[in-house]
Amino acid sequence: YIPTDNTAASNTEAIANVVIPEKVPVVAGEEGICKGCGVAALSISYYDLGYKTGEMAAEILADGADVSTMPVAFAPNVTKKYNAANCEALGITPPDGYEAIAD
């Protein structure tokens, strides 16, 4: 598993050069990493995450909410994606409900 991480996102080709020949499937935390070196992802939407962050900022700045008492918020939706080429190379059939990542 590779979570959402800028270093990993910048090095997906190097990761793929190691994991694909060794037949190691990588599940990624977001679509970009999955497209580069993964087989599947429950991908967050950075737009939705940013929108939620904006709502929380408004609660703090406009409404005076105490950040220390606010609950942790999560990305409201995830999308199920898979990398068709990597799945084929590793002999993996993606589960129903997953959408192929466009090239």
List each model region and its residues.
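A short acidic, amphipathic alpha-helical/loop segment
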Residues: N11-V18
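Hinge/cleft segment of the Venus flytrap/periplasmic-binding protein
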Residues: E59-D103
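Hydrophobic alpha-helical segments within soluble ligand-binding/sensing domains
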Residues: I44-A65
